[in-house]
């Protein structure tokens, strides 16, 4: 199940507040969760089924015109503290670049954040397999088709802050 916004926001808030406490003049954080499922059928038989779940955080900190970014997939509190600390330490030793900064506040988007693009539909693995088996059956119902390169069903859900 995809993580709720509040879970991702909590991680983002922690990273931003910790980076400010350690000296960043500004910071940016991306917290994302992605779940991908793939099922493949070849010659009417299951050829493969994969599922992957990824959680990740990327923190960018600024100190004046210095900037550094660090990413992690470990969301433990100790690791997040280490992530922020390492990012701040890296920022301190990077050279200044006059173009390093976040956009001015007046340039930030102020409209509705929820674009309502998320599709809550979920098919079980068995439903996916039945769907693509049916597609292969239709292909094989034609006399001249004796082999296929297979059929597949892919589903990816993502949430990010």
Q: Where would I find each of the regions flagged by the language model?
A:
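Active-site bordering "gate/hinge" segments
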Residues: 1-161
């Amino acid at each position: 199940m995809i993580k709720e916004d509040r879970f991702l926001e909590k991680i983002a808030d922690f990273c931003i507040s910790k980076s400010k406490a350690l000296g960043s003049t500004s910071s940016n954080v991306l917290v994302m969760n992605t779940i991908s499922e793939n099922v493949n059928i070849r010659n009417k038989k299951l050829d493969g089924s994969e599922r992957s779940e990824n959680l990740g955080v990327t923190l960018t900190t600024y100190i004046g015109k210095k900037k550094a970014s660090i990413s992690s997939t470990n969301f433990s509190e100790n690791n997040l503290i280490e992530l922020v600390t390492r990012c701040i330490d890296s920022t301190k030793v990077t050279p200044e670049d006059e173009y390093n900064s976040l956009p001015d506040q007046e340039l930030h988007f102020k409209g509705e954040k929820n674009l309502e693009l998320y599709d809550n539909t979920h098919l079980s693995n068995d439903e996916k397999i039945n769907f693509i088996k049916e597609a292969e059956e239709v292909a094989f119902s034609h006399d001249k088709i004796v082999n296929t390169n297979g059929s597949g069903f892919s589903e990816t859900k993502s949430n990010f802050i």
